[in-house]
């Protein structure tokens, strides 16, 4: 039995959860998110608490079913936080001449290449640049926010000798020692 699926989720008063068949819809002050539910997972909504269980299946499939129930519970908690508070990732640019600026729906990155990089971010994502070397990515969908942050980081990941590149604000880069004669 999944330890994650055992714990129930308390639904805040500002959030509305609608379950129809294998689709869950979560509405909050920031918007609405949808998620499909695995057929072996049963979700009960009682007294503004969501509890997760599995639909009785064969003994050999129960382990996978509980894993799906735990995943559904974690994803539901992420949806609820997304529609109430939202998700945020911060990136920092380290290197001489590395800078970023937002122009409408395009993030313009100068990362030491011979050309600037224009990254068009998807719908539902807000990108801010409080300074030239800081990027803040906000949105309701945790997966989308993480994906956008990962794509921006992949243009120039931090290198291990000087640490130059795009990194998450809390990321620790392990430095290598240079070759000695």
UniProtKB/Swiss-Prot annotation:
Keywords: Ribonucleoprotein, Ribosomal protein, RNA-binding, rRNA-binding. Belongs to the universal ribosomal protein uL6 family. This is Large ribosomal subunit protein uL6. One of its GO terms (biological process) is cytoplasmic translation. Part of the 50S ribosomal subunit. Signal peptide: none annotated. SUPFAM superfamilies: Ribosomal protein L6. It comes from the Bacteria. Disulfide bonds: none annotated. This protein binds to the 23S rRNA, and is important in its secondary structure. It is located near the subunit interface in the base of the L7/L12 stalk, and near the tRNA binding site of the peptidyltransferase center. GO terms for molecular function: rRNA binding; structural constituent of ribosome. One of its GO terms (cellular component) is cytosolic large ribosomal subunit.
């Amino acid at each position: 039995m999944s330890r994650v699926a055992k714990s129930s989720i308390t639904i805040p008063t500002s959030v509305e959860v609608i379950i129809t068949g294998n689709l869950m819809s979560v509405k909050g002050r920031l918007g609405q998110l949808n998620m499909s539910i695995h057929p072996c997972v049963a979700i009960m909504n009682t007294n503004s608490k969501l509890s997760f269980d599995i639909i009785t299946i064969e003994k050999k499939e129960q382990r996978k079913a509980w894993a799906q129930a735990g995943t559904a519970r974690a994803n539901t908690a992420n949806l609820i936080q997304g529609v109430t508070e939202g998700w945020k990732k911060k990136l920092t640019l380290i290197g001489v001449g590395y800078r970023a600026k937002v122009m409408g729906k395009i993030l313009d990155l100068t990362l030491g290449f011979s050309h600037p990089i224009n990254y068009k971010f998807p719908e539902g994502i807000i990108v801010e640049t409080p300074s030239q070397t800081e990027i803040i990515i906000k949105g309701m969908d945790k997966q989308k926010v993480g994906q956008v942050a990962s794509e921006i980081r992949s243009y120039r990941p931090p290198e291990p000798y000087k640490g130059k590149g795009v990194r998450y604000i809390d990321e620790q880069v392990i430095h290598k020692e240079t070759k000695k004669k």
